[in-house]
């Protein structure tokens, strides 16, 4: 049983490294304007995470559009705004499919 646990930990670490490599490639290709290739890298990364039954890393999860799956580069194919109407939050708009993602900002309690 202990051997299986070590194997799973090692394979999850390898999967994290591969996801990181794929997302860096997706970022590079998206900056060059090859959005179809960057979408393929994003799909491959998601498949690896699902296969290993691990959550997608948070720093990459927010850089992917949930609707169309494109890699978001702020200012190029997405728009980022801060709003503070009802509750303070960041609004990320994908300019390819016009979907909106809201991320709440945690405020300090006094």
Swiss-Prot record:
Localization, per the record, is: Cytoplasm
Q: Which GO terms describe its cellular component?
A: cytoplasm; ribonuclease P complex
The Swiss-Prot or TrEMBL record lists the needed cofactor(s) as: Zn(2+)
| Catalytic activity, as annotated | Endonucleolytic cleavage of RNA, removing 5'-extranucleotides from tRNA precursor
Give binding positions for Zn(2+): 65, 68, 94, 97
Please give the biological process terms from Gene Ontology that the record holds. tRNA 5'-leader removal
Which controlled-vocabulary keywords does the entry list? Cytoplasm, Endonuclease, Hydrolase, Metal-binding, Nuclease, tRNA processing, Zinc
Alphabetized InterPro entries for the sequence = RNP4 (IPR016432), Rpr2/Snm1/Rpp21 (IPR007175)
Q: Name one GO molecular function term.
A: zinc ion binding
Q: Cite the HAMAP family for this sequence.
A: RNase_P_4
Q: What does the annotation say about its assembly with partners?
A: Consists of a catalytic RNA component and at least 4-5 protein subunits.
**What is the documented function of this protein?**
Part of ribonuclease P, a protein complex that generates mature tRNA molecules by cleaving their 5'-ends.
> What protein family is recorded?
Belongs to the eukaryotic/archaeal RNase P protein component 4 family.
Q: Tell me what this protein is called.
A: Ribonuclease P protein component 4
Q: Which organism is it from?
A: Methanococcus maripaludis (strain C7 / ATCC BAA-1331)
Encoding gene (name): rnp4
């Amino acid at each position: 049983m202990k051997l299986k646990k070590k194997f799973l930990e090692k394979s999850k670490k390898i999967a994290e490294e591969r996801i990181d490599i794929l997302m860096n490639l997706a970022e590079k290709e998206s900056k060059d304007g090859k959005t179809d290739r960057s979408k393929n890298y994003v799909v491959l990364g998601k498949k690896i995470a699902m296969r290993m039954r691990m959550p997608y890393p948070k720093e990459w999860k927010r850089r992917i559009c949930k609707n169309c799956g494109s890699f978001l580069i702020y200012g190029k194919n997405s728009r980022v705004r801060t709003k503070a109407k009802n509750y303070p939050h960041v609004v990320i708009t994908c300019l390819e499919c016009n979907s909106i993602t809201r991320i709440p900002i945690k405020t300090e309690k006094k």
